[in-house]
Amino acid sequence: MAGHSKWANTRHRKAAQDAKRGKIFTKIIRELVTAAKLGGGDPDANPRLRAAVDKALSNNMTRDTLNRAIARGVGGDDDANMETIIYEGYGPGGTAIMIECLSDNRNRTVAEVRHAFSKCGGNLGTDGSVAYLFSKKGVISFEKGDEDTIMEAALEAGAEDVVTYDDGAIDVYTAWEEMGKVRDALEAAGLKADSAEVSMLPSTKADMDAETAPKLMRLIDMLEDCDDVQEVYHNGEISDEVAATL
């Protein structure tokens, strides 16, 4: 299956994302603590924790930092008194957007999210307004690799689909609870992924042009800058040509 991988669409944002690494680590640690608090400290028995561990390792977090966060969660750290909140809305160009938050204060969080939408030409929607457009999946990504080898190992391990892109990148899709098991099987076969994360995948795409793409990127950046926001998912599709101008 051909197409454009996320590597092409996100490469132009790498420098800005690297500058946010400190904030990213803070958010990952918060998720590790919360997941361990709610489901226990064993990643093999706690899919949410395993997903957080995989994300931490994909972002080059040290095992020591990771293990300390899990221990805090198991020990009942105050940071674990958080709830997961999902907000939905529409962004520039009619993009559908889902925002996953961890918060101990709903009023503060919704005010920050609403402010970002109002600043960037979007609208915060009601529950269910765009959720039906997304499916929760595990995504194991290889920036490059042998398609046949990865596909055979992935499908044998229980993956749902394997997609190869024009630039040589390969994504392995799994049920989100099975992502850790599939990644382990791939590594056992000598196939080390560049990243593994749980994501909300859109069933439809909204094409962004030179006018709407920068507005969408600004909205995503504003949302990601909110301390309570863990993840931002959207169905905006940015071509290589438009991405090169951002």
Curated annotation (Swiss-Prot):
Alphabetical UniProt keywords: Cytoplasm, DNA-binding, Transcription, Transcription regulation
Primary localization class, coarse: cytoplasm
Classification via InterPro entries: Integrase-like_N, TACO1_YebC-like_2nd/3rd_dom, TACO1_YebC_N, Transcrip_reg_TACO1-like, Transcrip_reg_TACO1-like_dom3, YebC-like
GO molecular function: DNA binding
Any one of the GO BP annotations: regulation of DNA-templated transcription
Source domain of life: Bacteria
Cell compartment(s), UniProt: Cytoplasm
Region (Disordered): 1-20
Keyword Transcription: yes
A GO cellular component entry from the record: cytosol
Record's protein name: Probable transcriptional regulatory protein YebC
Organism: Shigella dysenteriae serotype 1 (strain Sd197)
